[in-house]
């Protein structure tokens, strides 16, 4: 009854109007799973390959018909007849079919779409929500949201070098309250920016994208908004940054054009340390570039005992890259993006490896998202305690927050909000 009888993919659009892959999986019992694959703007060089057609006459070369054809042809022919509850076997079969180290032949977007849709169909077959099917009976921790309320870098058309300025409402009693706190700060920030003469247009992830050129000015606006919303910075709500520094690491220097700075690795570490000394920043993602291992070591030695140092481009949710980082003693946290590695099984392996090394995990969206809320379920399934899924606007971001509210309600009294447990200080 849990046998796969049909796999069908189609080309749909993501939140930036670019094509992406959506996959439907149907089982003999009638159980059904659907998954849409996200896409990143700032992508790591070591990520699995997102297959694009390259046909400039369609979607400016960004079509995904080849990935769709791979699902509807080769992958479907192989997997129809498989038991959907055999997730590991299904994922391994697709990886072996692809035969490349980076899923470049079939495309990570093809493989991941099938992988997640299979898990959803199996969850429906077993009459369980996805978080329970993947995480088992111990899945009960609701994550602290990292809410991206000012966008810069590749996510916005403004001069800010740092890509994301986030708030983390650790003092909330539950995820509903955390989302409310974030919403109140977001709307207060809008008023503050407007009063300062800045535009309040939003970036890819729903945060504001004002023409602020200084990192400190952006942080000051956020602190003021937290206070005016009735909360205490560094007590109720902390700050987090995603530098996405690979994007401005050129010729061995950190070229921060908005700030007018050209920094060596050591100077970049000092720059970040000074920000942490002056502001209640508890998490920095990609503070150094993906291949600046020396810089990462300096950063970890300087800040690792008191600040969460998240590897995104550094680790790309890849167990091999993570193992290299653990051995080198760099970073202390991994950002988890399912499409960076390209299958549910490999994602869970990487999360487990990080957990065993006492690294934290942060479940994450991509800048190109859809209404698919799978990552909310995966955040709870893995008990990772943190989720990064954008701001308090755009339905593609709110879909994940709303799903967390539903999951918390479903869990009832056994639900736990991670809250202050994530703090390193």
From Swiss-Prot:
The keyword Magnesium applies. It is found in: Cytoplasm; Secreted; Cell surface. Mg(2+) binds at residues 242, 285, 312. GO terms for cellular component: cell surface; extracellular region; phosphopyruvate hydratase complex. HAMAP family: Enolase (MF_00318). Belongs to the enolase family. This is Enolase.
């Amino acid at each position: 009854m849990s046998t796969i009888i049909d796999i069908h993919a189609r080309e749909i659009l993501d939140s930036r109007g670019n094509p992406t892959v959506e996959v439907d999986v149907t089982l003999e019992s009638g159980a059904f799973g659907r998954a849409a694959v996200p896409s990143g703007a700032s992508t790591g060089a070591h990520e699995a390959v997102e297959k694009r057609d390259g046909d400039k006459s369609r979607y400016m070369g960004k079509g995904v018909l080849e990935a769709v054809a791979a699902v509807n042809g080769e992958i479907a022919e192989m997997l129809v007849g498989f038991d959907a509850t055999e997730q590991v076997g299904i994922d391994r079969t697709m990886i072996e079919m692809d035969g490349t180290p980076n899923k470049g032949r079939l495309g990570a977007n093809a493989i991941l779409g099938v992988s997640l849709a299979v898990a959803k169909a199996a969850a429906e077959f077993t009459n369980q929500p996805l978080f329970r099917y993947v995480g088992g009976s111990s899945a009960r921790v609701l994550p602290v949201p990292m809410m991206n309320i000012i966008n810069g870098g590749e996510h916005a058309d403004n001069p800010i070098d740092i890509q994301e300025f986030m708030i983390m409402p650790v003092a909330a009693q539950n995820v509903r309250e955390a989302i409310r706190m974030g919403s109140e700060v977001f709307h207060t920030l809008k008023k503050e920016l407007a009063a300062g003469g800045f535009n309040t247009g939003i970036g890819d992830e729903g945060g504001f994208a004002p023409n602020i050129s200084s990192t400190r000015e952006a942080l000051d606006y956020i602190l003021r908004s937290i206070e005016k919303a009735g909360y205490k910075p560094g007590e109720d709500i902390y700050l987090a940054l995603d530098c996405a520094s690979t994007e401005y690491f050129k010729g061995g220097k950190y070229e921060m054009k908005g700030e007018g700075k050209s920094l060596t690795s050591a100077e970049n570490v000092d720059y970040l340390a000074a920000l942490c000394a002056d502001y209640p920043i508890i998490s920095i993602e990609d503070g150094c570039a993906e291949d600046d291992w020396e810089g990462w070591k300096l950063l970890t030695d300087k800040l690792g005992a008191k600040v969460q140092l998240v590897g995104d481009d550094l680790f790309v949710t890849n167990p091999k890259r993570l193992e290299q980082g653990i051995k080198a003693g760099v970073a202390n946290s991994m950002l988890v993006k399912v499409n960076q590695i390209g299958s549910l099984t490999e994602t869970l392996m990487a999360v487990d490896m990080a957990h065993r090394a006492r690294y934290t995990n942060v479940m994450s969206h991509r800048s190109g998202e859809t209404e698919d809320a799978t990552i909310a379920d995966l955040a709870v399934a893995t008990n990772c305690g943190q989720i990064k899924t954008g701001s308090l606007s755009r339905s593609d971001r709110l879909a994940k927050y709303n799903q967390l509210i539903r999951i918390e309600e479903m869990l009832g009294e056994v639900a736990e909000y991670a809250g202050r447990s994530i703090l390193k200080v």
